[in-house]
Amino acid sequence: MNGGILLSAPLYQMIYTDLKKQIEKGNYEINDLLPTEKELAALYSVSTITAKKALDLLKEEGYILRKPRKGSVIISNRKNESTF
């Protein structure tokens, strides 16, 4: 027993890490759209709030630009290397 401490990361962190790896591997190109919050929620079986948190982290790290009613656009395939 680990004293009740959870060792796994939050779901939004796991989704963020998965998407980041996909971006860095080239599965998504610059200017590609990521799936919507709703699509990510369905894909990962989480709430849209959890999907939003993952996308917010990608934005904070400089991987995506979030455009209202348009989606999340890839702007960099490496941390802090945006094309803007």
Feature roles, as predicted:
Residues A54-D56:
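Short, hydrophobic-biased segments on the C-terminal half of alpha helices
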Residues M1-I49, Y63-L65, R78-T83:
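Extreme N-terminal segment that seeds HTH/winged-HTH DNA-binding domains in transcriptional regulators
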Residues G71-V73, S82:
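Acidic, glycine-anchored pre-beta loop/turn
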